[in-house]
From Swiss-Prot:
GO molecular function annotation: adenosylhomocysteinase activity
SUPFAM superfamilies hit by this protein: Formate/glycerate dehydrogenase catalytic domain-like, NAD(P)-binding Rossmann-fold domains
Compartment(s) where it occurs, according to its Swiss-Prot or TrEMBL record: Cytoplasm
Protein name: Adenosylhomocysteinase
Pathway stated in the Swiss-Prot or TrEMBL entry: Amino-acid biosynthesis; L-homocysteine biosynthesis; L-homocysteine from S-adenosyl-L-homocysteine: step 1/1
Keywords attached to this entry: Cytoplasm, Hydrolase, NAD, One-carbon metabolism
Length: 481
């Protein structure tokens, strides 16, 4: 921006942020984050001269954090144009959004935005100032992808919008109807221009596979979540550090000695359980999958049901990606001052809608007492709900550390390059793909450089013996790390 007036006009017309004056603070934190994101910066340096994303117009729907700012600026350094919104109403870091806006990138993200604003912002990232169109999506949770597909269906028959099952669906469906009244082909026009999507998280990946199985997916997708250097690092090690940070910021509770229940023992649940045990909580795990349950038991965790644990534990963490894992009845049974939070993507893991009928008392932003009235001879009680059942580590904390996000976002950039450079070929017909293992290993090598790690090099004989090249890949695709 040439002048303050230019910047203010850009922010007023092409952004929705909390406070542009926070941009200097955001820029300083971005500079620190870059020193902790070796993989992402190495990819920026390697590919900047080639401009492999030239011509790409990327709509991004992903938590607008300091680490995401480094991702955005990497995409732009490689030639892309970018517009961004957060994928969660509580996860934005306002100084990060301000710094990105000050750099001339349209961004629509405010911490604590309403659901109406959320879906308005998700629409706006598909609208370009020159009237052009998005041709790539970078998604987290699948909302940007869902919006275009659902809207295009509604163009043919709005009956698909008639029966919302939640407050969020009610607001989303109303937003789609409003847009269709303004432009009856808004969604299909944009949908047909998109060449591909890269999806960040487990929940969004589930949506993609479901859409593909039903024949509804209209463009190819790369499942970034299941790259080893994403799921086994971001999901596990990231949650291991960010969960308890968020709980303690929100409540100042002493974790040691308390009984903590982790619902789900996938990678996110594993990291969450490790974090709570490291602070000397007694950790119980709930699971539906006997393999994951056996893993938990072999790690020394007690495997129980929520029905059993509800009135006994002190801290509850949902980490499943599933629906109503913690129900109204579970919360009704809980102890006074029990803490309930979610580290899965959507708020419906906890039946927040089922307890909205009770009195809510805000303690501070994203920390609420829900007051259950006296009943059946039991006195009034309060439970603590964090981030209104949405992602606790970003609602009540600052999310995962920069270093682990470098792995995830390096995969995102590589996936965007991979899809964009395949446009016009038959390399990626409509479907859901994962990145090849040699790219996974590349990300790991880049990340290792700052950890004083020195890799052993196979001899020719050793490589021949196990049937690999000296340069890798070192494992078969079916290998489970």
């Amino acid at each position: 921006m040439n002048t303050v007036s230019d910047l203010n006009n850009f922010v007023a017309t092409r952004c929705a942020i909390a406070d542009i004056s926070l941009s200097d603070f955001g820029r300083k934190e971005i500079a620190i984050a870059e020193t902790e994101m070796p993989g992402l910066i190495a990819i920026r340096d390697e590919f900047a001269a080639q401009q492999p994303l030239r011509g790409a117009r990327i709509t991004g729907s992903l938590h607008m954090t300091i680490q995401t700012a480094v991702l955005i600026e990497t995409l732009e350094a490689l030639g892309a144009e970018v517009q961004w919104a957060s994928c969660n109403i509580f996860s934005t870091q306002d100084h990060a959004a301000a710094a990105i806006a000050a750099n001339g990138t349209p961004v629509f993200a405010i911490k604590g935005e309403t659901l109406e604003q959320y879906w308005d912002f998700t629409h706006r990232i598909f609208e370009w100032a020159d009237g052009g169109y998005t041709n790539m999506i970078l998604d987290d949770g699948g909302d940007a992808t869902l919006l275009l597909h659902l809207g295009a269906r509604a163009e043919k028959d709005q009956a698909c919008l008639n029966n919302p099952t939640s407050e969020e669906e009610t607001i989303l469906f109303a937003a789609i109807k409003k847009k269709l009244a303004q432009d009856p082909t808004w969604y299909s026009t944009r949908l047909e221009k998109v060449k591909g999507v890269t999806e960040e998280t487990t929940t969004g990946v589930h949506r993609l596979y479901q859409m593909f199985a039903k024949g509804e997916l209209k463009f190819p997708a790369i499942n970034v979540n299941d790259s080893v250097t994403k799921s086994k690092f971001d999901n596990l090690y990231g949650c291991r550090e960010s969960l308890v940070d968020a709980i303690k910021r929100a409540t100042d509770v002493m974790v040691a000695g308390k009984v903590a229940v982790v619902c789900g023992y996938g990678d996110v649940g594993k990291g969450s359980a490790q974090a709570l045990r490291a602070l000397s909580a007694q950790v119980w795990v709930t699971e539906v999958d006997p393999i994951c349950a056996l893993q938990a038991a072999m790690e020394g965790y007690r495997v129980v049901t929520m029905d059993y644990a509800a009135d006994k534990a002190d801290i509850f963490v949902s980490a499943t990606g599933n629906y109503h894992v913690i129900t109204h009845d579970h919360m009704a049974k809980m102890k006074n001052q029990a803490i309930v939070c979610n580290i899965g993507h959507f708020d419906n893991e906890i039946d927040v809608a089922g307890i909205e009928k009770y009195k809510w008392e805000e303690i501070k932003p994203q920390v609420d007492h829900v007051i259950f009235p006296a009943a059946n001879g039991k006195p009034e009680k309060r439970i603590i709900i964090l981030a209104k059942g949405r992602l606790v580590n970003l609602g009540c904390g600052t999310g995962h550390p920069s270093y682990v996000m470098s792995s995830s976002f390096a995969n995102q950039v590589i996936a965007q390059i991979e899809l964009w450079n395949a446009v016009g070929t038959d390399k990626y017909p409509i479907g859901v793909y994962t990145l090849p293992k040699h790219l996974d290993e590349k990300v790991a090598r880049l990340q290792l450089k700052t950890l004083n790690a020195e890799l052993t090099v196979l001899s020719d004989q050793q490589a021949s013996y196990i049937g690999v090249t000296k340069e890798g890949p070192y494992k078969a695709d079916h290998y489970r790390y």
